[in-house]
Amino acid sequence: MESKNFKLPSPLATVIVGTQFGDEGKGKLVDYLSANYDIVVRYQGGANAGHTICFDGKSVVLHLVPSGIFHEGCTCVIGNGVVIDPVALLEEIKTVENLGYDVRGRLFISHNAHLIMPYHKLLDSLHESAQGDQKIGTTGRGIGPSYEDKVARKGIRVVDLLNPELLKEKLRENLSAKNKLLRNIYDREEIDVEAMVQEYEEFDKIIDPYVTNTQAYLTRELQAGKTVLLEGAQGCLLDVDHGTYPYVTSSNPTSGGACTGSGIAPNYIGKVIGITKAYMTRVGNGAFPTELLDETGELLGKIGHEFGATTGRKRRCGWLDLVALRYSLAINGVTEIALTKLDVLDSFEEIKVCTAYLLDGKELHDFPTDHQTLAQVTPVYTTLKGWMASNAAARTFEEMQLEAQRYVDFLEEQVQLPVTFISVGPGRDETVFR
């Protein structure tokens, strides 16, 4: 048989994943790398996670629009795996435009992305309030209820805004069930269907120019040789399948979610960069083996400004956990590590790193997948010498403080992956590449 030269996909896409409980500093890396990519895609989550970008003396928080929007040559895509709050999205678009950046023609929204409706946010808050001590720690932004409707095949998608009659029909069907909950369970007033239809028809007029079949668009661009950077929200340990269930988010922040949430085929993925904070934080409830409930934890939070970009909630702080990190690196197929917020450790004489867990007198090196077991483990620490000086002026690894270099070397040795990016300060330029 005559051989045929079929054109196979080139690995032109890079996935950026958080390897911890979110808040790892993904926004800075995406912002930094966006200048080298043609397209940046957000593939899951919603307005429950904020990416903070610092440039030109400004600090901007984005929840839905990809961080690459601040690079003029970059096109941004909100993928089908994202749940979109139209109100929050329009506010972000306005914020970006007010900073002098063009959005139209540079931002595309998947017609298959699901919408967060007002009843999702209301039910989210009411349900969380009713949980008492069993609260998950939701942001109250309607993310979970929107994903619930998606899985139940009752969700309202962006494409539904383009058909007012279909939108009205779906809203009536959904609100029939939601209003029963509001009235009978939570003793709240029902939501008016007609008012909501009118409100969302107005959203359609504004959003329509941005809506497209993003899966087809991304595939065409990749086939044409364009490069794509995919960014998720939260982190691996909050993944609904692989995280500390039930204290997790409602989607898949892992690298597998990048494909399902964007429509990009796996064989287009060439690199997976794991964003890892030099220490650990967590927002809300759930097991956290290395959490520091003392002055050290308070100091980490104070120096690191550890307050949620979305909710303003104080983050719990602790030392770096290599048991959890190895687990995340394996699940995501991470090819290299980006180490963030190393500067927060500049003031510590000693720095501890968890290398194993103790449970019932036995040492564990595998991350427990059930929350009950994880809540019972005790961390085993290795203590490293601190560097007690700033690395903010360093632009090469050799210019960093010697003990800071040793900290990075120790991390690489423990996880057997290269650390190729080190953030030594919040600014764009306060970065070391290797």
Swiss-Prot record:
Its cofactor is Mg(2+). The keyword Coiled coil does not apply. GO terms for biological process: 'de novo' AMP biosynthetic process; IMP metabolic process. Binds 1 Mg(2+) ion per subunit. Its EC number is 6.3.4.4. The keyword Metal-binding applies. Substrate binds at A309, T310, T311, G312, R313, K314, R315. Mg(2+) binds at D23, G50. It catalyses: IMP + L-aspartate + GTP = N(6)-(1,2-dicarboxyethyl)-AMP + GDP + phosphate + 2 H(+). Plays an important role in the de novo pathway of purine nucleotide biosynthesis. Catalyzes the first committed step in the biosynthesis of AMP from IMP. Belongs to the adenylosuccinate synthetase family. Homodimer. PANTHER family: ADENYLOSUCCINATE SYNTHETASE (PTHR11846:SF0). This is Adenylosuccinate synthetase. It comes from Chlorobium chlorochromatii (strain CaD3).
